[in-house]
Design a protein with these regions (language model features):
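Hydrophobic, membrane-embedded alpha-helices of multi-pass small-molecule transporters
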Residues: 9-17, 163-169, 179-245, 284-293, ...
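Selective recognition of specific alpha-helical transmembrane segments in multi-pass small-molecule
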Residues: 49, 53, 152-164, 227-253, ...
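Membrane-water interface regions at transmembrane-helix termini and the short interhelical loops
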Residues: 60-64, 68, 126-149, 214-217, ...
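TM-loop-TM module centered on a large, flexible mid-protein loop between adjacent transmembrane helices
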Residues: 65-70, 241-294, 345
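Membrane-interface loop-to-helix entry segments
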Residues: 135-164, 343-355, 374-382
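A generic transmembrane alpha-helix motif of multi-pass inner-membrane proteins
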Residues: 167, 370, 374-441
Length: 441
């Protein structure tokens, strides 16, 4: 049981852990200032709690979320939702973000300000060329490198956080940004969306189930018990890691010009490593981040191309891989800050829908739910998420007032009560559906 638990924990840790995730907690720490505690609580709630719960629920659904969504909502919605989701965790956001994170941490500190733009182009050309070639022939060597590097990288970050707490813990936090002053928990909650982990959990739940079954559980009870225990352990571990990184960012002295950029996480991670361990360790961190990001990039190109090739086989895997690599390369050259900025509206739409789907799946495990009621629930949540983005992006006063009038809007959860109402209606509306029973094969 203990061995299986450890192996399962490593699997879950590997699914969630990525170099890109490390830049958001210190950014939050720096920008939240004196409002750090409610801000990091919101971040952990969305970035860890929802992500781990989504994966756990996914591992209890043998056919994956695509089957659940097709059955409970509709096949066309499942295809559309998952296509947008894969594009988000693939070429539009995650793939270019891994490349720019590797560049910002590993290469950018070594270049003069005048050469950083050209440096990014040269780096991404080489980076994506190598990623593309390997994605055409994905090798298990990359998986093995990732399994070795991930725990070493995580250990380095833990040491950095502990030593950083002693070194900078006495430094006063900076003044919180306007967003955190207005709603610390809500802003932190939205920042947690940037980890993309809940979306990745939906996409890779079937892979997780297949891998877990190979561990040879003797019964369904043992399987489920292990999943829940390890899920709690992983959630606690990531919470501690995020809180530690956030605390480091909250007390690390960041220059005003860096703070104005809006995402000081890379600066904090790089500078803290150099100040605590020296320039050699900073170079080591750069190599670790670059290799970790690279293995992630290859994995995302492969998984996204395989998904679209499986759903739309008229186009070959190679064409998909080529297209997604080129898109990732083009977007990566916009820079890390730009990628994070334009990804937020899409995530503000995708995340509420994802959370609502998970809520429906959980409730349906215990009671039958009406299909029209489940469709209504997703429709309400989607409409509110779209209205929220349109209102804030285009300053449409009517939509902003409408969203702000909903319960929990200040916590960035205006869709929550409508989702609960929709699920309650699903208990009484006709055309009830039972949940699929999970069986060990």
């Amino acid at each position: 049981m203990a061995k299986k638990g450890a192996l399962t924990g490593l699997l879950l840790f590997g699914i969630f852990f990525g170099a890109g995730n490390l830049i958001f907690p210190p950014s939050l720490g720096a920008l939240s200032g004196e409002h750090f505690l409610p801000a990091i609580a919101g971040f952990v709630f969305s970035g860890v709690g929802i992500a781990v719960l989504t994966l756990i629920i996914g591992t209890l659904n043998p056919k994956g979320y695509i089957h659940e969504i097709s059955k409970k909502i509709s096949p066309w919605f499942a295809t559309l939702y998952l296509a947008v989701l894969y594009l988000s965790i693939g070429p539009f956001f995650a793939i270019p973000r891994t490349a720019t994170t590797a560049y910002e941490v590993g290469i950018s500190p070594l270049l003069s300000e005048a050469n950083k733009g050209l440096g990014l182009i040269v780096f991404t050309v080489l980076y994506f060329a190598a990623a593309y070639l390997i994605s055409l022939n994905p090798s298990k060597i990359l998986d093995r490198i990732g399994r070795i590097l991930t725990p070493v990288f995580a250990l380095l970050i833990v040491i950095l956080v502990v030593l950083g707490a002693f070194k900078y813990g006495g430094t006063s936090p900076q003044t919180a940004s306007a967003a955190y002053q207005a709603s610390a928990f809500g802003t932190g909650f939205l920042e947690g969306y940037n980890t993309l982990d809940a979306l990745a959990s939906v996409a890779f739940s079937v892979i997780a189930v297949q891998t877990l079954k190979q561990l040879g559980f003797s019964s369904k009870k043992e399987y489920i018990s292990t999943i829940w225990v390890v899920g709690i352990v992983v959630a606690l571990a990531f919470s501690a890691l995020y809180i530690g990184l956030g605390f480091l960012g909250n007390h690390f002295p960041v220059p005003a010009e860096v703070m104005k950029g809006g995402t000081p996480g890379v600066y904090i991670l790089s500078q803290a490593t150099q100040e605590i361990f020296g320039s050699t360790a900073q170079l080591f961190l750069a190599v670790m981040v670059t290799v970790t990001c690279f293995t992630t990039t290859v994995g995302l190109i492969v998984s996204t191309a395989e998904f679209f090739n499986g759903r739309f086989p008229q186009i070959s895997y190679k064409v998909y891989a080529t297209a997604f690599t080129l898109i990732g390369f083009a977007i990566a050259n916009l820079g890390l800050d730009a990628i994070i900025k334009y990804s937020v509206p899409v995530l503000v739409i995708l995340y509420p829908i994802t959370i609502a789907i998970v809520m429906i799946v959980i409730v349906n495990k215990f009671v039958a739910l009406s299909k029209p009621g489940m469709q209504l629930t997703i429709g309400l949540v989607t409409a509110i998420a779209l209205a929220s983005v349109l209102g804030s992006s285009f300053k449409i006063e009517f939509l902003e007032n409408l969203i702000n009038a909903l319960p929990f809007a200040s916590a960035s959860l205006p869709w929550l009560v409508p989702a609960i109402i929709g699920i309650l209606l699903s208990l009484v509306l006709p055309n009830k559906q039972e949940s699929d029973v999970f069986e060990m094969e």
